[in-house]
Every structure is written in C-alpha cells, then in structure tokens.
A protein has these predicted regions:
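C-terminal outer-membrane/trafficking sorting elements
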Residues: 1-68
Length: 68
C-alpha cells in the first residue's frame, strides 16, 4: 500500500518492507492484538523477516493490513 506522503508498506516472500521518506517508528501487531515488534525506521527502505500470519502495521498515524 502507498500513502500519499510517500510511505509504502508491503509484504513479499516472508519479509516486511517499509519505505518511508522520514525517520519514524513502526509497530507490528498481530490480528489477535498482540505486539509482535517495534521497529525504528530510518529514511529509505527497511526490510525485516516476519513469520507467516496476518498483521497490522502502524507507522505514524497510518495503519496497513499485511498477510503473509
């Protein structure tokens, strides 16, 4: 998914990709509401491995649903 501000979040081959134009923080939460991980995001693209499942990724005031 792409946000008008240049933020992009997507999943591919068991990896979560987050591309952001500014430093930010991402919060990865399972659909059951459990916190999986917090990530500090530098400017540019961040890639992290993530187990199969469904997640809600919060970055800034946006949320994205990702399924692996």
């Amino acid at each position: 998914e792409v946000d008008p501000n240049g933020l992009r979040v997507w999943g591919e081959n068991g990896r979560l990709h987050i591309q952001t134009p500014v430093m930010d923080t991402a919060c990865i939460v399972t659909f059951e509401g459990r916190l999986y991980r917090n990530l500090s995001l530098p400017v540019g693209e961040t890639i992290t491995s993530i187990p199969q499942g469904s997640y809600i990724i919060y970055v800034g005031n946006q949320s994205y649903k990702i399924r692996f």
